[in-house]
Amino acid sequence: MTKCSVTIFKAAALFSFFGAVAVSCGRNAGDGGAFVVSPSAAIDGLHAPWDCLDDRTLFRCFSDGESFYFSYEVTDTTPTYAANFTGEATVENEDRVEIFFSPKRSMDDYYCAEIDPLGRVLDYSGHYYRDIDYGWGFRTMRLVGQLTENGYIVAGKVSKDELRKLGCDLENGFWMGVFRADYHTDMTVNWYSAVSTDDISPDFHKPEVLFFTKIR
């Protein structure tokens, strides 16, 4: 079994609902410039150009007839999370991974989940620019997180029907963002994105950090 297969099966082992979905190692081949969700879809490493940093986060995703599945394997020597979780706002000061979905690149409407190392979530909807509704949440998203020797793994799934109802055209294309916040013991933070930009400071609520995605 390849290293990439081991990674996704470690994440899948956290979920009974992942079942026996088989995945193989490899990079997503793309489709007319799109990131194609398939058994080999992967993003190996995120970027913080504003801090001149890259990390070793491995993001993988695949789908079946009902759900879109995703996992992050994060290398982090200082996992930062709250022992006393008092609600979704707690996630704002923790290490976390983030996934954004938007029907259009303009981000007229977009939907976000920010997930800490233990699988606890802050989810919300937004309208460009930063018109956020923290009262909104995914109905079908299921999440789990687990600390590892080298950091943590987060895995999740969301119903494809829910994504469609949110306006995402899964087969013909929608926009997705993959991000990470890495807090340190002094509470400084590095912000990582799958898409590297020329910005001098991080801002994930803008179209430039999203990438075009299709689900086969």
Predicted regions: what they are:
Residues 1-2, 29:
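Accessible peptide chain termini
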Residues 2-12:
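Bacterial N-terminal signal peptides that target proteins for export
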Residues 10-20:
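Bacterial N-terminal signal peptides
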Residues 25-216:
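Structural preference for beta-rich elements and adjacent junctions enriched in aromatics
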